[in-house]
Amino acid sequence: ALRLDAVHELKDDTPDRDGGLHLLAELSEATAALAERLERPLDLIAESDLNDATMVTPVADGGLGMSAQWADDVHHALHVALTGETQGYYADFADPEALTKTLTRAFFHDGSFSTFRGEEWGAPVDPATVSGHRFVAYLQTHDQVGNRATGDRIGASITPGQQAAGAALYLLSAFTPMVFMGEEWGASTPWQYFTDFRDPEMGRAVSEGRRAEFAEHGWTSGEVPDPQDESTRDASV
């Protein structure tokens, strides 16, 4: 399986311009042809925040043909239910129905208003026509942990029992489960955002930008690890 990062940022106007296939649909068809020649399954998994099942709808039916896509809404609902955090994009998931809805229909925002984005977001998923295995569910990822100010895993905020309950919910769901590295044994080490830019100005800009970003959420500059510092990398390996 090959994961395609942030496919919502791929700009391809081919379908609108001349009726051709979108790049992702082309990749899907090429991968299917290769899988047939090799006589083994090959999968493309998309990271997309569009909340649109067109991503995993077959190309023949007008979709993009991905084997599966990440389901961030499931993560968000689980995270809020377990930790009680409701800042930033977690705000809408404080809704008591969020967990039930995401565990049955993958997307919480399926045409509803997203306060974080300031607009209506997503489209409904019909479980009768879109299989649950098309959605990848998880309690932690490199993004959701690494993009926290100190890279703390969810286990730093909840009890082992709560973490086990959260794991049970996504492992036993209708979705394809994904276990984050170290989660299987309850690793307590952080996964901090680290970089190795050789350009001093670029490195400084990243470090300062990260501190400024988290300052808006109440973190002081001294609390946010410097991405360019080797100790930040060492703390995560």
What do the PLM-derived regions correspond to, one by one?
Residues A1-T14:
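Active-site groove signature of glycoside hydrolases
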Residues L24-D226:
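Conserved alpha/beta catalytic core and glycan-binding cleft of carbohydrate-active enzymes
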Residues G222-V237:
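Short, intrinsically disordered, charge-balanced linker/junction segments flanking boundaries
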